[in-house]
Every structure is written in C-alpha cells, then in structure tokens.
C-alpha cells in the first residue's frame, strides 16, 4: 500500500519525550512506517505559542533533535513543516532560516491570531497582514508550500491569490 500523509505531530512528541523515532508508544513510528510499500510523511513542528518565550529557538531545537532521529532511517521519505507562524516572530528572514534547516511547508496560523493572520476558529474575517504577505512572498521565492488548513476564510483567499504552492 502507498501512503502520503500530509500531517502528523510525531516530531513534537519525539522532542518532548526526548525519545527515538522507533519508540513503540508513538502513534507514527519507524516500525509502523516500515509496514507500507511506500510511505511519505509530512512531519509538523509545532508548539503552543503560549508555552515558550522563544518559539523560534524551541522549534529550531526540535528540528535539530528530530533530524538526528530521522537520519537513523534513511529509507523514510519525509518533509518538515512548521505549524504556526508564531515561530517566525516578526522577522521574514526567519523563513530563510527555517528553509535552511529543511522546512518546506509553513502553516501561517494555527489556533491563535498572530502577526501573519487569523485562524478559522477565531473569525472568518481579518485576512492576512502586510507581514503575512511578505512571508508568503519569501516562501514563494524559496518554492515553499503554504498550508492553509487553519487560516480563516478571508485569509484563505488572500493567501491563495498570492501563493505559488498552496495546500489545504
């Protein structure tokens, strides 16, 4: 069977537990993935923006830890994503920084309004900010995908007009 999964939180769980990707308690682990003929996974790096003072550092450290774990499984095909633009703080250069660390997809908003835009669980209105537009422009320049799964309706259409690679 061939599987392409666009989202799982395993990377965040591995980092919080400081465990190996083969840990049997993980919902998605190396043993589970080895049961499929072909498997491609998008691993979301996520944190609750209210839990950490420095989301950029936290996600950066998570990517580093996860990368050491995933390298033990060279047959696995995967993409690293970031869920929640809070990690970018207020600096569009952080898009470049995370791209250099292997991130190929960013979800601009999760469940909180941030400097980029407004999630659907907060309001259907509000769209994306000027900073959000700059983030999408930079992502386009780097051929990164914009995950629109949590953004509100207005933001969805504003992003869809601007992004070269939108997914929802």
Which ranges hold each PLM region?
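N-terminal hydrophobic targeting/anchoring segments and the immediately downstream early-domain regions
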Residues: 1-125, 130
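Histidine/acidic residue-rich metal-binding segments in metalloenzymes
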Residues: 92-100, 122-168
């Amino acid at each position: 069977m061939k599987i392409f999964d666009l989202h799982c939180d395993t990377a965040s769980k591995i980092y919080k537990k400081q465990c190996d990707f083969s840990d049997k308690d993980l919902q998605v682990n190396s043993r589970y993935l080895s049961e499929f003929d072909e498997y491609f996974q998008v691993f979301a790096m996520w944190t609750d923006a209210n839990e950490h003072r420095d989301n950029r550092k936290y996600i950066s450290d998570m990517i580093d830890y996860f990368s050491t774990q995933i390298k033990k499984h060279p047959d696995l095909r995967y993409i690293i994503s970031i869920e929640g633009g809070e990690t970018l703080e207020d600096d569009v250069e952080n898009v470049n920084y995370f791209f250099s660390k292997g991130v190929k997809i960013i979800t601009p908003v999760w469940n909180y309004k941030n400097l980029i835009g407004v999630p659907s669980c907060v309001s259907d209105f509000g769209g994306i900010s000027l900073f959000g537009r700059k983030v999408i422009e930079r992502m386009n320049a780097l051929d990164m995908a914009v995950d629109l799964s949590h953004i509100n309706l207005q933001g969805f259409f504003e992003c869809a007009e601007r992004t070269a690679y939108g997914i929802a």
